[in-house]
Design a protein with these regions (language model features):
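Structural signature of extracellular appendage/secretion-system components
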Residues: 1-392
Length: 394
């Protein structure tokens, strides 16, 4: 009879703990749409055993099990999947920021909708073709002036819009860095709370771990991170190869604003000497962007690249070396190319209507200033003149 009831108790323990496990399943179902919630999984364990015979007499210890119990309720997370997910979401954020910038520039150029920017250049060219047939026709002359004024206005507006977008991205970088610092400080606080809850070894800080894991997932969007957890439940975070959260504190990023533009550069205060003006940047912007080398991770790095560190100018396109300084900086490249285009158009028009020539010998002007040989002056013989053949003064 005792053996019969013993078996019933074993079966009853299985049913009771299965019922408790169903409660955990119900909790999982109730939180399906809860942001940051991690599925909980029940792990069963053996109850105590009853020794039937002394092991010193027999080779094998004869024991009778008392049933099953719930050993622990754990997070159903995988370290490998966590690492991969955070890395790939960071990569997605990197290219999403670049795509957003490219799309915005495309909209400014109105390549798909509206009046294309290149149409303004074509219209000016067509106006010159018209005036070449009848140079003295005031209608054709006014058409050139109108199309030239339109090109100047659109170029100025486009360049200004690109500068404004740079400022907008600069503000986004500041907000992102502030958010990263907030996340890091909260992770450090959660580390301490989790340690206190789990110090006795009898309870898992489920809710706290859920929040911490969610913050780590979010942090992966902003940059390349490495996460390790010790036996006490404390999580260490490295960002861009530098310790960001450890057992002592969270090492917040700083922001250095450039003179003139106000463009921000994130740096590590703990490794920098601010008084001497020596800053260690968080993100390495030089070098090849490659998935193999994991240099294409994080939205902040992407925004730093597309924004650039200044406003693009035609001098940036003067040589291969100078272009290498802005290569990959989307907005600076577009600004520099725009400046080159407009400068070439203006230079070509000047060469036609008011060409220059160099003096073969030194001369003294009417105001008494002496100019050496080789000085560039207006080529009066080949420059444009009015209807009465007089020089045009603007």
């Amino acid at each position: 009879m005792a053996n019969g009831f013993g078996s019933l108790y074993v079966g009853a323990s299985g049913l009771q703990n299965a019922q408790n496990a169903i409660n955990t399943t119900a909790n999982n179902l109730a939180n399906v749409d809860t942001k940051g919630y991690v599925r909980q999984q029940v792990r069963y364990a053996d109850k105590n055993y009853t020794i039937l015979k002394d092991s010193r007499v027999n080779v094998n210890m004869q024991q009778s099990g008392l049933g099953v119990s719930i050993g622990d309720v754990v997070h159903a997370r995988d370290i490998f999947l966590d690492k991969t997910y955070r890395q790939e979401t960071g990569r997605m954020s990197f290219y999403s920021a670049r795509y957003e910038t490219a799309t915005y520039v495309e909209d400014l150029m109105q390549e798909l909708n509206g009046q294309q920017f290149k149409r303004s250049v074509s219209d000016l060219w067509q106006a010159f073709q018209e005036v070449s047939t009848k140079p003295a026709d005031s209608t054709n002359q006014n058409l050139v002036l109108q199309k030239a004024d339109l090109l100047v206005s659109r170029t100025q507006k486009l360049y200004s819009d690109l500068q404004n977008y740079q400022s907008n991205i600069n503000d986004q970088i500041k907000d992102d860095v502030d958010r990263v610092n907030t996340i890091g400080n909260r992770i450090y606080e959660l580390n301490l709370q989790i340690q206190r809850v789990e110090a006795g070894g009898t309870e898992t800080a489920m809710t706290l771990r859920d929040e911490r894991d969610s913050l780590l997932d979010e942090l992966g969007n902003y940059g390349r991170i490495e996460v390790t957890e010790d036996a006490t439940g404390f999580t260490y975070v490295d960002m861009e190869g530098v310790r960001f959260v450890d057992e002592n504190r969270c090492y917040n990023m700083g922001l250095k604003a450039a003179d003139g533009t106000g463009f921000y550069t994130p740096y590590w205060p703990q490794q920098s000497d601010v008084e001497k003006g020596q800053y260690v940047p968080v993100f390495r912007l030089s070098g090849e962007i490659s998935s193999e080398m994991n240099t294409d991770i994080g939205s902040i790095k992407s925004k730093l690249l597309v924004r650039g560190d200044a406003y693009g100018r035609r001098e940036d396109m003067a040589s291969e070396k100078s272009y290498g300084n802005i290569e990959g900086c989307t907005l600076m490249e577009v600004q520099a190319e725009l400046d080159v285009l407009f400068s070439n158009i203006v230079r070509s028009m000047n060469d036609i209507y008011c060409p220059n020539t160099e003096t073969t010998s030194a001369f003294t002007s009417t105001d008494g200033v002496t100019y050496p040989a080789g000085t560039k002056i207006l080529d009066e013989e080949n420059c444009a003149r009015g209807v009465d053949l007089s020089l045009i003064h603007i």
